[in-house]
Amino acid sequence: MGKIIGIDLGTTNSCVSVFEGNEPVVIANSEGKRTTPSIVAFVDGGERKVGDPAKRQAITNPTRTIFSIKRFMGENWDQVQKEIARVPYKVVKGDNNTPRVDIDGRLYTPQEISAMILQKMKKTAEDYLGQEVTEAVITVPAYFSDSQRQATKEAGQIAGLEVKRIVNEPTAAALAYGLDKAHKDMKIAVFDLGGGTFDISILEFGGGVFEVLSTNGDTHLGGDDFDQVIIDWLVQEFKNDEGADLTQDPMAMQRLKEAAEKAKIELSSSTSTEINLPYIMPVGGVPKHLVKTLTRAKFESLAHNLIQACLEPCKKAMQDAGLSNSDIDEVILVGGSSRIPAVQKLVEDFFGKTPSKGVNPDEVVAVGAAVQGAVLTDEIKGVVLLDVTPLSMGIETLGGVMTKLIDANTTIPARKSETFSTAADNQTEVTIHVLQGERPMAAQNKSIGQFNLTGIAPARRGVPQIEVTFDIDANGILKVSAKDKATGKEQAIRIEASSGLSKEEIEKMKAEAEANAEADKKEREKIDKLNQADSLIFQTETQLKELGDKLPADKKAPIEAALQKLKDAHKAQDMTTIDSAMAELNTAFQAASAEMYAQSGAQGGAQAGPDMNAGQSNAGQNNGKQDDNVQDADFEEVK
């Protein structure tokens, strides 16, 4: 059985892990980093960059660099207006009242953008394992709705991954934390404040069973919001000083975003930081600089409401779990924003104990996902995970009321049936409107789907018996069915994401993603070949200078001819000619090396020929990389 990788698909950063050698391993990406920015950039020529390469060019390409796409996942157009106002890239209204990212007229769903990030994580794992990866456990915020979970699953499918399980992020963190403590009896609180979302989950584990008692949170509260209060402050300060509005300049706003994130991070370990952005914007034709000192106290004042917003979900989670603060044995901090000192103080004050620093907030969720993957493949035995549904689910009934079938914090998988009837005489059809949320009226909750049950036998109002069944799987994804008990007619719906993507659309996007992955691979191979040629040109020119007149003219000519051919091919990026020119150059050097060896005998020839040839061979076979174990040596001939 192949490996099931664990992926933390984050708002700001993503991380991938795999269970290997009886322990979870966090895998470094091609840039050598253990976390990857959740950023996708589209650059000239159709090339696509993901992760750190995308982040590095964001300032000069703000309108085609996509970040925080997780905040758009599974949401409809009306729910993301606040997010749209914050991002420099173009978001438009697409099919089914959904947000789409517009890149040069091509509309991308949030799932497609997320799939590009997932492809990067998949490739990272494949490079590490040396084998193809097709299965994954992907984490989501505990407070993600059904449609947001479904959208995450679709993103995985588009990326070429079979999503074996969707796991709540705090639950994954608890799995990672408690793996070596699974047979102790403990109650823990996982406080997860990430880049875009906030979750609080209360868990109990013992005897290998991890049971989620309650969960609460806010899917639109996270590090992005803390960055935004700094950005808003800087914009206002510049307006006060210079009378100009930075929000009108996308490039300036991208610089502000990077500076705000950097300042927020620095203020976790320092009491003040300087924000220095030279030439931020011309005012009246004169370049202006933005230089401000931000203290930790000022930042905490700016972010006061955000920090306090974490408190109410904590209270509700504890209340739903039926526990008092003294019942909690350990508090685990997860997510980069949990490093903010004021947040840590709030957690300590609320729970009455110092939070544990025993886990890496940036990696623990991916580690937990890998642990869940190992549980599914039986690499880990004796561990049972009992998660919950974060929000109540029900249907709309007479008078626009929401009637709950499954309450929030119900352990999943779960199944519940209730019998309803018609609201009018001789009614032969009913509409089942499926809702998710905690409010009493249907209009106040999130609509996640609807379907019709037809062919009901005509009868007086209240006589027909219609059995409605809600079935939630282990991923927290819902299936609803309705059955007329008299006729036996039944209709069912598996709630899809609010994106409304059909299987055909998902398959089409998957094919496009695979095609792009192949194009990306070819582009990397092309760059490697160009670098290889560039290295060979440099080494050849260096050795020609060093050898000087020692190299016979009849041997030097073919080397120079092949070198010029390689230079021309490199400039034109003619890959076929590059291959032949490199082969000719190596052949010419080998011929020269052999003759010089024969002429100079065992002393001089043994030094000049093979050394010269080895240099070309290394350049041709190691993609232009120098071998760290090879050192240049100076030789002195003793006569």
Curated annotation (Swiss-Prot):
Family: Belongs to the heat shock protein 70 family.
Its job: Acts as a chaperone.
Phosphothreonine PTM sites in chain numbering: 197
Compositionally biased tracts (Acidic residues): 629-639
Molecular function via GO: ATP binding; ATP-dependent protein folding chaperone; unfolded protein binding
Low complexity composition-biased segments: 613-624
Keyword Nucleotide-binding: yes
This protein's UniProt keywords: ATP-binding, Chaperone, Nucleotide-binding, Phosphoprotein, Stress response
Name the UniProt record assigns to this protein: Chaperone protein DnaK
Region (Disordered): 600-639
Organism superkingdom: Bacteria
Organism: Bacteroides fragilis (strain ATCC 25285 / DSM 2151 / CCUG 4856 / JCM 11019 / LMG 10263 / NCTC 9343 / Onslow / VPI 2553 / EN-2)
Induction details: By stress conditions e.g. heat shock.
Stored HAMAP family: DnaK
Pfam families: HSP70
